[in-house]
Curated annotation (Swiss-Prot):
Reactions this protein catalyses: alpha-D-glucosamine 6-phosphate + H2O = beta-D-fructose 6-phosphate + NH4(+)
Pathway it works in: Amino-sugar metabolism; N-acetylneuraminate degradation; D-fructose 6-phosphate from N-acetylneuraminate: step 5/5
Gene behind this protein: nagB
Active site positions, chain numbering: 67, 135, 137, 142
Taxonomic path: Bacteria, Pseudomonadati, Pseudomonadota, Gammaproteobacteria, Oceanospirillales
Protein name (record): Glucosamine-6-phosphate deaminase
InterPro entries: Glc/Gal-6P_isomerase, Glucosamine6P_isomerase, Glucosamine6P_isomerase_CS, NagB/RpiA_transferase-like
Record flagged with keyword Cytoplasm: no
UniProt signal peptide: none
Family, per entry: Belongs to the glucosamine/galactosamine-6-phosphate isomerase family. NagB subfamily.
Class of enzymatic activity (EC top level): hydrolase
EC number: 3.5.99.6
HAMAP family the UniProt entry points to: GlcN6P_deamin
Keywords for this protein: Carbohydrate metabolism, Hydrolase
Amino acid sequence: MRVIIADSPEAVARMGAEQCIRLLQDKPAAVLGLATGSTPIALYAHLIQRRQQGEVSFHQVRTFNLDEYIGIAPQHPQSYRSFMQKQLFDHIDVLPENTHIPNGMGDPIAESRAYEDKIHSAGGIDLQILGLGRNGHIGFNEPTSSLSSRTRAKTLTQETIRDNSRFFSADEEQPHLAITMGIGTILDARKIMLLAAGAAKADAVKAMVEGPISAMHPASALQMHPSALVIVDTDAASKLELIDYYRWVQSETLRVQGAYL
């Protein structure tokens, strides 16, 4: 696992976008694993800008999102399909038929199996983008999720439900279930990039990077991946014991390669 400490949330997003663009320049038909939530929004804004400047194309790209609420139709304003259309897809040249998000209105077991098959048929995911929950969840893999789990239905924790309640009005019934890629599915990606910003994520970042690998902290499974990149801002990195070492590695990488990444 490689840790990059950025000066600000904006720098986290910019560095993350640069990784995506380098991949697409090397492999225009890459398969991207995408995430929702507040952290990726700034990343997607950078990708949109770079697309508008003609630096990158998504015309051959295929995408697979991590998760979707069960019981919410794609056209619902709080569905992750709606989120992705608003925050990314409507502003780039990706083909609609190449964007994949679990169907929250289908049979969860059948949909989960079909989603795994679609990923396999696409040749697997080249770069999986992740955010990080305050309790260490990635996707909707809550604490105690199996580290070898595949795409399936999951019951959300009360903490996750509270965290997401701000997106739903008082008269809306908030989903308590979701279809999510499993941790094993995520670890199958050839590269993984996790972004986190803010002091509220500091405990989760420390447990992910420096804690034991444990189902109680699902993101800690990334320690087992041969090509996992963690990009965090100074607040999210504030509780890392080896923060000086991570900064030293950054400076040495810059000295030798001429760039952090």
